[in-house]
């Protein structure tokens, strides 16, 4: 029991770091990246999109690794690589080294995807609660990230110091993971089956592939808002950096609050909840791009975070329950869907931002939210009607 509690604490604390000084650190700094390196919206969108693809490939690879060997080594490698690449970004003074190190930072964070199947196993029959709590910790990190950036800029006069903080925190957490994470024999055991078969077979299961499409769409909703809304507020409205970062903070507060509530209440989100949230999100977004009062903007940003906050953990828990094995491989497929969505939609918003303005490019977010609600409903219906056709390939 004590070992399980320690494992849960390590997993949740990592996802707090992931949101605070991992890729969650990037949205508040997009405008700073553009200004420091002379990067256009289009180029910045492509760089972030490619980073998302790198992250997804890393998450798929580490998912297969987890199904065979467990997650301790992969999560430890995440800590070291994040620390090294973050420190490198601090010293990068030209665009090419910066882009290379930013992609390495995405790669390192992608390896951390192994934490999802770890938590799914640790919480067993309470997977929905476990996923909501895990992503609530990520949300807390993302909530604090804009404050961290603002504090670093205020105290040092430069945004790069935030990456020094990132390197220090990941470096401190490395020994905690390496020496503290104790995997159960069941996770560490291997059978003589080819675990890659699980990934191939999953491609033929309609519920799984519909779920992957759902991750693609939800990423188009949440990542475009997190990445581009602060930039839009700074560049195309009368609001400044302080208001933009405060709006992002308010959004992350709603994003986190709903996950905490769902985790503590052990609540399961249904397709009806998702549909209502998608409609409310579209209305809140429409108002947020037109208001001039900062306090109304903050309220609308909070409401938007409240709407899309449950999307990722709810869909992941539903698929994990549908197929209760091979969760490492499934997590990799989720990562492929969500980060491919981030690549496509974040890049598209950047291109549209240069052509017609970010106000119109960001319309992608509410549209993706509505289509995601449809996909979630279809996934829910198919999961009730069908049994998974994938034979278990390893003891997970």
Q: Where in this protein do the model-derived segments appear?
A:
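C-terminal transmembrane helical hairpin of 12-TM major facilitator-type secondary transporters
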Residues: 269-315
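Cytoplasmic helix-loop-helix junction between adjacent transmembrane helices
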Residues: 101-137
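Pair of pore-lining "gating" transmembrane helices in MFS-fold secondary transporters
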Residues: 2-28, 103, 205-221, 302-306
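Helix-loop-helix hairpin linking two adjacent transmembrane segments in secondary transporters
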Residues: 126, 133-182
């Amino acid at each position: 029991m004590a070992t399980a509690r320690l494992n849960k604490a390590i997993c949740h604390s990592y996802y707090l770091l992931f949101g605070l000084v991992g890729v969650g650190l990037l949205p508040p700094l997009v405008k700073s990246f553009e200004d420091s390196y002379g990067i256009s919206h289009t180029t910045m969108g492509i760089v972030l999109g490619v980073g998302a693809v790198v992250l997804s490939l890393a998450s798929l690879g580490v998912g297969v690794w987890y199904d065979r060997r467990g997650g301790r080594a992969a999560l430890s490698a995440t800590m070291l690589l994040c620390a090294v690449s973050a420190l490198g970004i601090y010293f990068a003074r030209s665009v090419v080294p910066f882009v290379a190190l930013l992609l390495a930072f995405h790669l390192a964070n992608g390896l951390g995807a192994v934490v999802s199947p770890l938590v799914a196993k640790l919480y067993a029959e309470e997977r929905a609660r476990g996923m909501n709590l895990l992503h609530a910790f990520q949300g807390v990190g993302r909530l604090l990230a804009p404050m961290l950036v603002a504090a670093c800029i205020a105290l040092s006069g430069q945004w790069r110091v935030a990456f020094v903080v990132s390197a220090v925190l990941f470096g401190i957490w490395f020994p905690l993971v390496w020496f503290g994470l104790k995997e159960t024999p069941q996770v560490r055991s291997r059978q003589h089956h080819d675990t890659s078969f699980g990934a191939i077979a999953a491609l033929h299961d309609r519920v799984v592939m519909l779920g992957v499409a759902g991750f693609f769409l939800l990423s188009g909703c949440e990542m475009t808002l997190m990445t581009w809304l602060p930039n839009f507020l700074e560049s195309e409205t009368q609001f400044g950096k302080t208001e933009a970062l405060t709006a992002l903070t308010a959004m992350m507060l709603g994003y986190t609050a709903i996950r905490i509530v769902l985790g503590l209440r052990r609540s399961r989100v249904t397709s009806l909840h998702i549909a209502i949230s998608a409609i409310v999100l579209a209305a809140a977004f429409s108002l947020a791009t037109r208001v001039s009062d900062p306090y109304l903007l903050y309220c609308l940003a909070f409401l938007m975070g409240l709407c899309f906050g449950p999307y990722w953990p709810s869909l992941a828990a539903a698929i994990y329950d549908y197929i209760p094995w091979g969760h490492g491989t499934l997590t990799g497929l989720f990562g492929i869907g969500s980060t491919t969505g981030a690549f496509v939609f974040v890049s598209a918003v950047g291109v549209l931002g240069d052509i017609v303005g970010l106000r119109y490019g960001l319309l992608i977010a509410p549209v993706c939210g509505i289509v995601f609600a449809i996909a979630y409903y279809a996934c829910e219906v198919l999961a009730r009607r069908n049994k998974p056709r994938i034979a278990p390939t390893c003891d997970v």
